[in-house]
């Protein structure tokens, strides 16, 4: 059974950003509502209200809806028109396929001066003699009745015959009320009998008395395994009983009354509960997914079963996940570790062991707006950023250099008596080489006497000719 709650109204007010007090249109159809309540307090600005296909038995708590223009109460359990005088702007009222037998109750709609359309087809009163004439004469403001227009000549004839039609309508109402009283009594009896039958079925095999037999105790204990039926057999018998009851209920003829509608709803609820119990039994608790073993080893897991591609470059590792295109990004959680990457997609883990160690703090995750794919870029360890470009260089520490030096020395076999020139240690005496000092002044040119002139005398005071 359904009730009108604040949460129900908010869920049906998405077109108004889930704001209740300013609602102008509200649809609460097929909610199994039994009673009208709270709407006149929470939604006073309503203009259109849909309540068709529910279990409402009485029109109530709508008198404060002064702006209401259209009220749809089709396919309910209403037996009388009442409590609509306060709906001053009501222009259209739909009461199709209800159980209205008191046709004289439409007189309460005289105060609704803006009422133009009224639907009463499918009600017991619609089968009364002179039903249309009575309604047309009683409500002069009506323009349409059951989807058919009212002409002025039809209204004049109805007003002329109103004094004759009214007592006939009263008699038909009395007959209908007597029939309804009998049907209610029969429905109560059937309901009590069904309750008794259910109690008997639940206590089957027990007549209210306890028996003790000392001689039978040993034999009963010995044959205990044979007497206990397995769970599967009990489940099958219960299933057969439920199917038989279901067939019996749906094949049983019944009248179309408010009680029969309630009975069918209760039966459907019972079936629903039984199915939920069966589904809960069938559900097996799945063991938790192991992502990391006891020894700390990460495993490859693809529980969401999505496609992916892994690219291993010199500088970084790129993981491309084919995430669903229209899935919200808030449902994705990425966790990058040095040796593996884990992505939670709607609570399902995707884990992949990486071929090389990466930097989690330098990693990035981006999602495509066109395809929805998730691309995770994870730079490898040892990456150095220089001049706006990335270069992959191996960084050597002092410990690595010392190891290399030791390895080179170990390759050459050393003996006690070796040639000093081939010694691996450097010669300290030849570290600094002596420098030769050269004169800064130019050397004086030598004067060679000419062989041609024997009388030539060289004067040292005379500068040489250039």
Swiss-Prot record:
Residue ranges of every copy of the CS domain listed in the record: 301-396
Biased composition (Basic and acidic residues): 185-202, 269-279
One annotated Gene Ontology cellular component of this protein: cilium
Residue runs in coiled coils: 178-204
LRR repeats: 22-43, 45-66, 67-88, 89-110
Record's keyword terms, sorted: Cell projection, Cilium, Coiled coil, Cytoplasm, Leucine-rich repeat, Repeat
Subcellular location, principal: cytoplasm
Keyword Repeat: yes
Location of the LRRCT domain: 123-161
GO BP annotations listed: outer dynein arm assembly
Subcellular location: Cytoplasm; Cell projection, Cilium
UniProt biased composition (Acidic residues): 450-460
Entry's family note: Belongs to the tilB family.
Stated role: May play a role in dynein arm assembly, hence essential for proper axoneme building for cilia motility.
Subunit and interaction comment: Interacts (via CS domain) with ZMYND10 (via C-terminus).
Protein name: Protein tilB homolog
Organism listed in the record: Macaca fascicularis (Crab-eating macaque)
């Amino acid at each position: 059974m359904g009730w009108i709650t604040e949460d129900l109204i908010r869920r049906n007010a998405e077109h108004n950003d889930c704001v209740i007090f300013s609602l102008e249109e509200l649809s609460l159809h097929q909610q199994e509502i039994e009673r009208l309540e709270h709407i006149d307090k929470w939604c006073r600005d309503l203009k259109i209200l849909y309540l068709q296909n529910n279990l409402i038995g009485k029109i109530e708590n709508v008198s404060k809806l002064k702006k209401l223009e259209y009220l749809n109460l089709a396919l309910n359990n209403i037996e009388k028109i009442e409590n609509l005088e306060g709906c001053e702007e009501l222009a259209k009222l739909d009461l199709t396929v209800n159980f209205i037998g008191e046709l004289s109750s439409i007189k309460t709609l005289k105060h609704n001066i803006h009422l133009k359309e009224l639907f009463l087809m499918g009600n017991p009163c619609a089968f009364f003699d002179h039903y249309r004439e009575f309604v047309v004469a009683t409500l002069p403001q009506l323009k349409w009745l059951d989807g058919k227009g009212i002409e002025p000549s039809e209204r004049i004839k109805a007003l002329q015959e109103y004094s004759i039609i009214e007592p006939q309508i009263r008699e038909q109402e009395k007959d209908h009320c007597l029939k309804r009283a009998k049907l209610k009594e029969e429905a109560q009896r059937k309901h009590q009998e069904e309750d008794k039958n259910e109690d008997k079925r639940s206590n089957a095999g027990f007549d209210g008395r306890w028996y003790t037999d000392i001689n039978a105790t040993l034999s009963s204990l010995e044959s205990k395994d044979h007497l206990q039926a397995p769970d599967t057999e009990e489940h099958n018998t219960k299933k057969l009983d439920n199917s038989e009851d279901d067939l019996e209920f749906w094949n049983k003829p019944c009248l179309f009354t408010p009680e029969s509608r309630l009975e069918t709803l209760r039966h459907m609820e019972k079936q629903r509960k039984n199915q939920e119990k069966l589904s809960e039994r069938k559900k097996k608790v799945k063991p938790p997914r192991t992502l990391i073993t006891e020894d700390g080893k990460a495993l490859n897991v693809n529980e969401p079963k999505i496609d992916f591609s892994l690219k291993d470059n010199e500088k970084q590792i790129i993981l491309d996940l084919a995430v669903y295109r229209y899935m919200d990004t808030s449902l994705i959680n990425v966790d990058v570790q040095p040796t593996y990457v884990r992505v939670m997609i709607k609570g399902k883990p995707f884990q992949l062991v990486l071929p090389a160690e990466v930097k989690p703090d330098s990693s990035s995750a981006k999602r495509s707006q066109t395809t929805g794919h998730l691309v995770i870029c994870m730079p490898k360890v040892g990456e150095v950023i220089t001049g706006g470009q990335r270069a992959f260089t191996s960084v050597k520490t002092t410990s690595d250099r010392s190891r290399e030096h030791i390895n080179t020395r170990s390759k050459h076999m050393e003996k006690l008596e070796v040639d000093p020139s081939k010694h691996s240690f450097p010669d300290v005496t030849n570290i600094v080489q002596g420098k030769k000092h050269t004169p800064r002044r130019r050397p004086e040119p030598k004067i060679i006497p000419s062989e041609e002139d024997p009388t030539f005398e060289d004067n040292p005071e005379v500068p040489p000719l250039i």
